[in-house]
């Protein structure tokens, strides 16, 4: 609701690789890495995304699909989610959501207010797993190279999202498919 337009496509749609990295990223960092653009208008997105998503063999997970996968003229059902468990939402955010919902309705789309599946459980499991990966793979570098403020921030992350470790980390990584499945089913409806 700020006048900018963006697309953050799913994993593999835009190739990603950081040539300055000293070691490979953890599995969660790899699977959450999505690249996209922030543009002035949708036509800028349409101009740039086909270039951004061209094949690059340095990303072994890139899927070279065309950016435009079909007609945008079909009407769809759109989920409007207001739930932000554990966080207070500013009234201006709700106003922006209503403006967006009204614009979608005016364009002929069906807007349905829903609660996304398992949002708090998914978020907590994801953050705790990520913190488990971070503390093992990046923890020494955070402590060595991070400022006191960065270290304080990560200490707070580790406190709020107690890192999964050992077998618990492996089990929650396996459970990612359960959460992904629930969201996949949800996203086929909206």
Whereabouts are the PLM-identified features?
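Short low-complexity, flexible loop/linker segments enriched in glycine and/or proline
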Residues: 2-5, 121, 125-131
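Short connector loops at secondary-structure junctions
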Residues: 109-126, 158-159
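Charge-dense, low-complexity intrinsically disordered segments
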Residues: 32, 36-39, 87-91, 121, ...
């Amino acid at each position: 609701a700020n006048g900018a337009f963006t697309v953050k496509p799913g994993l593999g749609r835009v190739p990603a690789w950081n040539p300055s990295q000293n070691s490979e990223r953890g599995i969660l960092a790899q699977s959450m890495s999505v690249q996209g653009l922030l543009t002035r208008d949708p036509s800028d997105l349409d101009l740039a995304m086909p270039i951004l998503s061209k094949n690059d063999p340095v990303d072994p997970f890139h899927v070279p699909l065309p950016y435009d996968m079909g007609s945008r003229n079909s009407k769809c059902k759109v989920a409007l989610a207001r739930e932000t468990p554990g966080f207070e939402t500013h009234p201006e955010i709700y106003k922006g959501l209503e403006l967006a919902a009204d614009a979608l309705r005016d364009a002929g789309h069906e807007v349905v207010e829903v609660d996304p599946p398992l949002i708090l459980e998914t978020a907590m499991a994801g953050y705790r797993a990520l913190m488990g990966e971070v503390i093992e793979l990046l923890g020494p570098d955070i402590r060595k190279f991070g400022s006191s403020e960065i270290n304080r921030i990560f200490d707070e992350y580790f406190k709020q999202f107690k890192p999964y470790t050992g077998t618990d980390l492996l089990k929650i990584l396996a459970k990612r498919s359960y959460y992904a499945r629930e969201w996949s089913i949800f996203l086929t409806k909206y």
